[in-house]
Amino acid sequence: MGIHSAEKSQLSAKGMLAKVRSIFKQLPEPARDPRGIKPDIPLVDCLMSALAVFGLKLSSLLQFDGHRNIDMVKHNLTSLYHVKKAPDDTNMRQRLDKLDPRSIRPAFTAIFSLLQRGKVLEQYKFLGDYLLVACDGTGMFSSKAVHCENCCEKHHKDGSVTYYHQMLGAVVIHPDQKEVFPLCPEPISKPDGSTKPDQRGDPYP
């Protein structure tokens, strides 16, 4: 297989998923899950199943839980994501909630490197040598009762507090290209050691 053919294979959906899986597989496997039980599903399968939620265009982890045993979904999980056993909604949350988000950054870096070496990003140059990057924030979690030390805080006029997590997402785009390439998302949280809450108040009167 020539170099060009090898690069083309790596840049296919199957090739990029295989690359991501190889990186996820390098993450240390915890001896026990959050319940203190030895995991029966490898961490790499939990991560690839979570990635499949997006690839299979499922709206939530709960919908994934309801579809994971459907023959077509099982086939895609096996053939594309190489998942031998998909976790249920609860198991996936428990395993991934304990994972440091920074540990998955190498997967984004590796795919971006493949796109650079394969000259794919040349097709996304705009106004000369620039890349267009679209950014947006998204809410991940909000509660007035459940919170952690990294939660942002929104103090309301009635004295109540809303605790929330948000994330900044960014993708490389081009007006003439259908595909977009996500960059590693960045969690939005209080700075280390900060005790100052978010004072923006209610967004609507």
Specify the residue positions occupied by each region the protein language model found.
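Active-site-proximal, Lys/Arg-enriched surface segment
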Residues: 93-177
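Short, motif-level signal for alpha-helix interfacial/capping segments enriched in acidic residues
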Residues: 64-68, 109-118, 199-205
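Gly/serine-rich nucleotide phosphate-binding loop at the start of the catalytic core
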Residues: 3, 12-87
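Short, flexible active-site-proximal loops enriched in glycine and acidic residues
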Residues: 61-63, 74-87, 104-108, 122, ...
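Generic structural signal for well-ordered, non-membrane alpha-helical segments
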Residues: 40-42, 101-104, 108, 200-204
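Boundary/linker elements of alpha-helical solenoid repeat scaffolds
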Residues: 6-7
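Electropositive, glycine- and tryptophan-enriched low-complexity nucleic-acid-binding patches
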Residues: 155-205
